[in-house]
Amino acid sequence: MRILGIDPGLRVTGFGVIDVSGHRLAYVASGVIRTPTADLATRLGTIFQGVSTLVREHAPDQAAIEQVFVNVNPQSTLLLGQARGAAICGLVAGGLPVAEYTALQLKQAVVGYGRATKSQMQEMVTRLLNLSGQPGSDAADALGMAICHAHSGNTLGTISGLAPALARKGLRVRRGRLVG
């Protein structure tokens, strides 16, 4: 199964594509969609087109996207929601089922700790996918979203279920921290 993860943002939208076979995760691609400094409609169109292109190029079976959190600034929350909507439209237009996860669910599934930092997310994504270098934070979050979705439907959905995959890489989670 191929999963496309999306970390939505108005300026930068991260994406990550992984293949899942049983409990094995394999990196396919990741990166960002950058929007131009332009009016809102142009930026949203760029996100929609970028996501639509990813769906055509990588032919994922499913997609996962982060839910909007309520920010201190209501305007920022509204703009993020619109960017997320443009990304979802690109996914749905490509015929994909779309799952949604909170940031807490994402961090819990990938790191085993709901308050994990960006650097902890990047490190864990790098290790789980055997990457030679760390992806940027937006791409790492998107890859994490795909990993979270892969774990949601089976025993890998809990940190105890992650134990075999971590052990193969010489790692374990102790009190919310990655120990290796």
Curated annotation (Swiss-Prot):
MF-aspect GO terms: crossover junction DNA endonuclease activity; DNA binding; magnesium ion binding
Top-level taxonomy: Bacteria, Pseudomonadati, Pseudomonadota, Betaproteobacteria, Burkholderiales
Key words of the record: Cytoplasm, DNA damage, DNA recombination, DNA repair, DNA-binding, Endonuclease, Hydrolase, Magnesium, Metal-binding, Nuclease
Coiled-coil ranges per UniProt: none
Stored InterPro entries: RNaseH-like_sf (IPR012337), RNaseH_sf (IPR036397), X-over_junc_endoDNase_Mg_BS (IPR020563), X-over_junc_endoDNase_RuvC (IPR002176)
UniProt protein name: Crossover junction endodeoxyribonuclease RuvC
Gene3D superfamilies according to UniProt: Ribonuclease H-like superfamily/Ribonuclease H
GO BP terms in the entry: DNA recombination; DNA repair
